[in-house]
Amino acid sequence: MRTAALSLALAALCLPLAAAEGGKPGPFTHVLKAGEIAEDCVTLKSGQSREYAWTADTSVKFNLHWHEGETVHYPVRLDGQWKGRGRFTADRDQSYCWMWSAPKAMGATVTGTFKPIESP
């Protein structure tokens, strides 16, 4: 019984991570309510690259980040952006997240695309 309860608790902890595993190649749309965030995460190996481009119908906060224990690293961190574009190359095997935050006073719609880049 105790093992079953522990297994259930561990499975519940994994659900938010599974739901956040986006970042698949192709187009995406996030409709955010006021103050909400959207996050697309993908695991990249060292040297793998991904191109991204997005636009929003209002200015949003945008960042690209990864976690190392309790520390969050931000290779890209921008406030008040209506659009963004770039190419990110992983420097380590890691799960990386692209995140958008709507303003607290209003919602936002973010549309864009992800494109994996094949290594030469």
Region locations from a protein language model:
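Positively charged n-region of N-terminal signal peptides that target proteins for export
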Residues: 1-5
